[in-house]
């Protein structure tokens, strides 16, 4: 389900330990086998409610291609917790409040503001900080190229420029400009029961730290895959795997490190309007450029947790 292979690199990398990769792949393989077994005989028969599944948030950090029907409005609170760095205690939680509007079945705009809380003590290379801050504001434009109901898979392009006021990792006051470009694809594997998604993302950022005046230019390249199975009406459970690579420079210039995350996902709807989704990602393998360590906790965190709640109108 998930393949890790990047051929261009600025530094030589050692191979991931075979055990780590096995642990990363095993949960998704098991999810596929359980889904296929429990849905034996269902292939080729479209469930009555299959057309009602909105896949955008059923996969966790990975996202589906759906953007809502023309005229649909959505309000959403999306909280992401980042935990675990070497040398001390590292805990941050960022909550984005977002409003979305679908102008057509193929185009949607949204705007959001993100507030973050930092609780950092004794972490190597990061100043101690315990405070809340306005982290960023942004807007997101999504263009759906293929509708899953009329094509072999759904495909949506997303562009999200943002203006930041605090460094995402350290919380230090900053002037930040960046954008995230994403390709979101999904497919219905077993009608009404099992869905799969695949994402590619590229996020360049320029950050000027107000305290020191230092300017940082960096970029992140990500690839992710996920499965979600409807285990009862309006309730989905699944698993996802993501590989994130950090670079120094806006154009993927110098490789800095990478992390492989895996974890479970959950999604449920309540009535016709309300939904909740949750995901937990654990870094099971990573590598800092030039290091022999088994994780990259310089550029990434050990644990990522996401909780979304929203309403559609």
What is each residue range found by the language model?
Residues 22-36:
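Bacterial N-terminal signal peptides
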Residues 41-313:
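Transmembrane beta-barrel domains of Gram-negative outer membranes and organellar outer membranes
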């Amino acid at each position: 389900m998930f393949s890790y292979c990047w051929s261009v690199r600025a530094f030589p990398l050692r191979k991931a330990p075979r055990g780590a990769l096995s642990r990363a792949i095993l949960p998704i393989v098991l999810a596929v086998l359980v889904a296929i077994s429990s849905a034996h005989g269902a292939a080729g028969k479209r469930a009555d409610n299959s057309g009602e599944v909105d896949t955008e948030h059923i996969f966790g950090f990975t996202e589906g291609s759906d953007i809502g029907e023309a005229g649909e409005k959505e309000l959403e609170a999306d909280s992401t917790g980042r935990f675990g760095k070497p040398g001390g205690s590292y805990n941050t939680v960022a909550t984005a409040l977002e409003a979305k509007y679908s102008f057509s079945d193929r185009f949607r705009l949204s705007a959001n503001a993100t507030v973050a809380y930092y609780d950092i003590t004794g972490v190597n290379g990061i100043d101690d900080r315990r405070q809340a801050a306005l982290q960023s504001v942004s807007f997101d434009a999504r263009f759906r190229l293929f509708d899953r109901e009329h094509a072999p898979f759904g495909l949506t392009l997303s562009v999200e420029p943002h203006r930041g006021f605090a460094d995402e990792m350290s919380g230090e006051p900053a002037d930040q400009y960046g954008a995230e470009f994403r390709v979101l694809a999904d497919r219905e594997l077993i009608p009404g029961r099992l869905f799969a998604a695949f994402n590619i993302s590229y996020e360049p950022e320029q950050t000027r730290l107000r305290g020191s005046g230092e300017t940082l230019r960096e970029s992140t390249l990500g690839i992710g895959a996920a499965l979600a199975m409807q285990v009862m009406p309006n309730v989905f459970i699944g698993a996802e795997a993501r590989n994130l690579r950090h670079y120094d420079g806006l154009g993927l210039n110098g490789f800095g490190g990478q992390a492989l995350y895996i974890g479970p996902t959950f999604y449920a709807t309540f009535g016709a309007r309300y939904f909740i989704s949750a995901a937990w990602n654990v870094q099971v393998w990573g590598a800092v450029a030039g290091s022999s360590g088994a994780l990259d906790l310089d550029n990434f965190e050990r644990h990522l947790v996401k909780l979304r709640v929203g309403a559609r109108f």
